[in-house]
Curated annotation (Swiss-Prot):
Keyword rRNA processing appears in the UniProt entry: no
Gene name of the encoded protein: metK
Enzyme class: transferase
Name of the protein this chain belongs to: S-adenosylmethionine synthase
Function: Catalyzes the formation of S-adenosylmethionine (AdoMet) from methionine and ATP. The overall synthetic reaction is composed of two sequential steps, AdoMet formation and the subsequent tripolyphosphate hydrolysis which occurs prior to release of AdoMet from the enzyme.
Amino acids binding ATP: H16, D176, G177, K178, R243, F244, D252, R258, K259, A275, K279
Co-factor binding comment: Binds 2 divalent ions per subunit. Binds 1 potassium ion per subunit.
Chain positions recorded as L-methionine binding sites: E57, Q100, D252, K283
Cystine bridges: none
Species this protein is from: Lachnoclostridium phytofermentans (strain ATCC 700394 / DSM 18823 / ISDg)
Catalyzed reaction equations: L-methionine + ATP + H2O = S-adenosyl-L-methionine + phosphate + diphosphate
Location(s), subcellular: Cytoplasm
Sequence positions that bind Mg(2+): D18
Superkingdom assignment: Bacteria
Complexes and interactors: Homotetramer; dimer of dimers.
Length: 396
């Protein structure tokens, strides 16, 4: 039993400067993985008025046209004319990637990783984590996708905002935008009321705020907000500054990895601090966070807990996690210690084991770079599958 509480989460559209950078970094990663699934990639992007900078380190046998990837990605997002303050065709693109020779990789790396899915247990054990760090995964049965309600709703709003812009329903909208929702939870920890909704959207200069308010309510709020969660006490804030014409990279600079809470659980669960986009699956910041979500989601889907948070930690060069911690916040059918042992038995959480378990050497990452990496029922992501849930039910 808990006290009533209000919890707030936010989302941003694909046209937000930080999210543009995430999408460019993951577009580069996907393009390299298409050519060479063994590519090692650490690709960071920065964006500002009229300029994109792509930097980092890659080890690959593939070759991709980075400039074209940048321009195509920016155009796809919707920055395709000068009056938006940023134009994919005319912006400057600086590439500062250190392209390392494929021969630099140690022979042992090549031998161990060449046939990832055929590796022996000894080979998996031999591949250590690429860095130290801790990663968290979370799941809750408060939504169909087993995500916290506030971030789930915030993403639905920004996705709908993008949809009505792209399909021409609201042609005066521009790509940048944000949502924020405040949800009231009752004593049982269930979401019961929508306390506040904030939505800011970039727009053409000649549209009135009255028109924007009317259209956002009709075309964004009505299709998305559950009627049973909204009443006369719900507060709505639409473009509360009164004007949002200057936006995107023309309004703010952006960087890869600046929206890690939007990418994950909206602040409802803890975060280890590592960003995802632009990193290949040998980086545990990304792969172990995906594995932690996979574990937590299967525990909740199996009925072993209503809520589950898992922490993994790694030491550089060591395969086995240095720690596994599970917290079910008093909702578990087994103790946290028992669940930890169950996880050790059923999930291979060594870096190479994660790559094999989730088949991560594929170009599947750009689609995750906006609107969240988790709870994406619209995408067939391996870490969102609940294929272990049936197996775990035997512990009920």
């Amino acid at each position: 039993m808990q006290n009533k509480l209000l919890f707030t989460s936010e989302s941003v559209t694909e046209g937000h400067p930080d999210k543009i950078c995430d999408q460019i970094s993951d577009a580069v990663l996907d393009a390299l993985l298409e050519q060479d699934p063994m590519s090692r990639v650490a690709c960071e992007t920065a964006i500002t008025t009229g300029l994109v900078l792509v930097m980092g380190e890659i080890t690959t046998s593939g070759y991709v046209d980075i400039q074209k990837i940048v321009r195509d990605t920016v155009k796809e997002i919707g920055y395709d004319r000068a009056k938006y303050g940023f134009d994919a065709d005319t912006c400057g693109v600086i590439v500062a990637l250190d392209e390392q020779s494929k021969d630099i990789a140690l022979g042992v790396d090549k031998a161990l990783e060449a046939k990832q899915n055929e590796m022996t247990d000894e080979a998996i054990e031999a591949i250590g984590a690429g860095d130290q760090g801790m990663m968290f995964g979370y799941a809750s049965n408060e939504t169909e996708e087993l995500m916290p309600y506030p971030i789930s709703l915030a993403h639905k709003l920004t996705k709908q905002l993008s949809k009505v812009r792209k399909d021409g329903t609201l042609s005066y909208l521009r790509p940048d935008g944000k949502s924020q929702v405040t949800v009231e939870y009752n004593e049982e920890g269930k979401p019961v009321h929508l306390n506040a909704v904030v939505l800011s959207t970039q727009h053409d200069p000649d549209v009135t705020q009255e028109q924007i308010h009317e259209d956002i309510k009709k075309y964004v709020f009505e299709p998305v907000l559950p009627k049973e969660m909204v009443d006369e006490k719900t507060k709505f804030f639409i473009n509360p500054t009164g004007r949002f014409v200057i936006g995107g990279p023309n309004g703010d600079s952006g960087l890869t990895g600046r929206k890690i809470i939007v990418d994950t659980y909206g602040g409802y669960a803890r975060h280890g601090g590592g960003a995802f986009s632009g990193k290949d699956c040998t980086k545990v910041d990304r792969s172990a966070s995906y594995a932690a979500r996979y574990v937590a989601k299967n525990i909740v889907a199996s009925g072993l807990a209503d809520k589950c948070e898992i922490q993994l930690s790694y030491a550089i060069g060591v395969a086995q996690p240095t720690s596994i911690m599970i917290d079910t916040f008093g909702t578990g059918k087994k103790s946290n210690e028992e669940l930890t042992e169950i996880v050790r038995k059923h999930f291979d959480l060594r870096p190479a084991g994660i790559i094999k378990m989730l088949d991560l050497r594929r170009p599947i990452y750009k689609q995750t770079a906006a609107y969240g990496h988790f709870g994406r029922n619209d995408l067939n992501l391996p870490w969102e599958q609940t294929d272990k849930a049936e197996e775990l039910k035997k512990y009920l």
